[in-house]
Amino acid sequence: MSQRTFLVTGATGDTGGATAEQMLARGHQVRALAHRQDNRAERLQGLGAEVVFGDFLNLDDVRAALLGVAGAYFCYPIRPGIIQATALFAQAAKEAGVKCVVNMSQISAREDAKSHAAQDHWLAERVFDWSGLTVVHLRPTYFAEWLLYLAPMIRAGLLHVPFGTGRHAPIAAEDQARVIVGILENPSQHGGKAYPLYGPVEFTYQGIADVLSRVLGKEVQYKQVSFETMLQMMASGGQKPPAGHNARALYGEFEQAPDRRPGDSFAMQHLREVAIDHQNGVFAGTNDLVETIGGWPATTLEAFIDKHRAAFA
């Protein structure tokens, strides 16, 4: 296989970091775009990646990052600005002659989405489609890593969440990275496609609690609660928080981005609305794309929990 250079954005995040590592392991050159120097960026540098620092919303930064790469992975965080960032990225990619862009969207991205972030992702997909670039959209269900955000509750033996009886097949970030790598290495087979991504088995949250209990060897109790109660429990180690406790501080920088709806943040509005989507079946489904494109069977929920046992114990 010939060595090529690929740009990985969001390189200090879950899917971006895994994509960069897998690309390097396969002998490719990786240029990783990061927002700032930190231990995650230093780790990628230690693995051999060229780490560059820049802003998605600065055209000069994006042009410099894309210069000379064969393909790129575009992953924008849950914050305002994705439509502008997509337009800048598409323009710079066309100028640089990039052969393929893999766009991380989400399964809830649709024209009538109530989540502003999800609707923006749908519009960002359309911007890429209009660009004339070879683009592949990925629409994953809930990441298996979402359970790590719930770890304070799980450590307390609880899984109190607002997702009703909806089902999803949790998909690990490293499995999504395998798909990203597979597409970028063979873009002609995938250009113009939109792929929903799932783990191997669907679960309700009661089912997830049952798997947690079995793998961890302790009871994890499921209960349907309100969205705000879940946030409070996430931020307080699974216990009822004291009066005045600010659960939303858990999300740090997300709280700096207000939503179009007064009194809410962009991320909180998204999380609240996709919880309703989950109840309504939007996140349901399963397929074998991790194996057929990524070349490896998707990680089971049991294996993911066992791998991260220390976080849940």
Question: What kind of feature is each model-predicted range?
Answer:
Residues L67-Y73:
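Short acidic/histidine-rich motifs immediately flanking catalytic phosphotransfer sites
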Residues G54:
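Cofactor-binding loops of NAD(P)H-dependent oxidoreductases
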Residues S2-R43, L57-D60, A64-L67, I78-A87, ...:
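Oxidoreductase cofactor-interface core, primarily capturing Rossmann-like NAD(P)-dependent enzymes
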Residues Y73-F74, N103:
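Structural recognition of the beta-strand scaffold that forms the well-ordered cores
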Residues Q232-A313:
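A hydrophobic C-terminal alpha-helical subdomain
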Residues D61, G71, A303:
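Residue-level recognition of oxygen-bearing side chains
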Residues G48-E50, V135:
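Short, conserved active-site loop motifs that form the nucleotide-linked donor/cofactor pocket
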